[in-house]
């Protein structure tokens, strides 16, 4: 079971799991749940037994952004696992913070979209147009940030950059990240996914 902190993560994971299956990774049946937030994981744990098929779950992974509050999220997850009767029956519980690991014992500080931005497929627009599109998008976001002022900067820059960039393309305008991934916006074989793939192999 994959417990996702945000809708974008929950929408992307089925696409990535399908890709891994096509690459020969034999994953058992995976249930994906959008928890919306991990502020109160204990309450989430109480509701999980009510989800159809939850009694068959043996392994759980928490998927969340490293910011804000990686340390607090990790503590909440550990407390929930230790105190929950449901989680205590699991063979395996783990967490993964996007965009991935900085070192074997440290996570990069960032967001899910930071990982996707690294893997953006440059071939999705006409040859030579990628850098122009990208630069124009960066300039647009810079103008938006300047207009918001120093007190209210854009949060999760990569997310805004991806959606603004897709709006300038014919193939991905109006799509959410999961849809864009399904239609080939990202190179799912990119090294940015290595940490996530290694974790999913353990399911």
Short names for language-model regions:
Residues 1-56, 61:
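RecA-like P-loop NTPase motor core
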Residues 3, 7-16, 20, 48, ...:
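Nucleic-acid enzyme cleavage-core boundary/entry regions
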Residues 9, 67-71:
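Short acidic, S/G/P-rich loop/turn micro-motifs used as interaction or catalytic elements
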Residues 13, 64, 77-78:
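Hydrophobic packing residues within well-ordered alpha-helices of enzyme cores
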Residues 40-44, 70-77:
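Active-site-adjacent loop/helix micro-motif of nuclease/hydrolase catalytic cores
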Residues 57, 69, 81:
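Surface-exposed acidic loop/strand-edge motifs in secreted or periplasmic proteins
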Residues 60-67, 98-100:
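Short loop/turn segments at strand-loop or loop-helix junctions that form parts
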Residues 72-162, 166-167, 171:
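Activity-critical C-terminal alpha-helical subdomain
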């Amino acid at each position: 079971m994959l417990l996702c902190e945000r809708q974008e993560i929950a929408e992307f994971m089925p696409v990535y799991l399908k890709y891994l299956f096509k690459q020969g990774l034999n994953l058992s049946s995976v249930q994906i749940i959008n928890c919306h937030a991990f502020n109160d994981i204990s309450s989430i744990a109480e509701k999980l037994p009510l989800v159809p098929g939850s009694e068959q779950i043996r392994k759980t992974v928490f998927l969340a952004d490293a910011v804000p509050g990686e340390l607090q999220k990790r503590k909440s997850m550990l407390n929930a696992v230790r105190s929950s009767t449901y989680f205590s029956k699991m063979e395996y519980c783990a967490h993964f913070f996007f965009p991935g690991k900085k070192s074997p014992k440290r996570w990069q500080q960032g967001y899910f979209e930071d990982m996707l931005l690294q893997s953006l497929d440059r071939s999705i627009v006409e040859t030579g147009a990628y850098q122009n599109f990208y630069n124009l998008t960066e300039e647009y976001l810079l103008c938006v940030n300047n207009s918001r002022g120093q007190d209210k900067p854009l949060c999760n820059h990569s997310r805004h950059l991806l959606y603004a960039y897709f709006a300038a393309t014919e193939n991905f305008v109006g799509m959410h990240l999961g849809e864009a991934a399904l239609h080939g916006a990202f190179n799912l074989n990119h090294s940015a996914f290595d940490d996530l793939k290694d974790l999913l192999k353990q399911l």
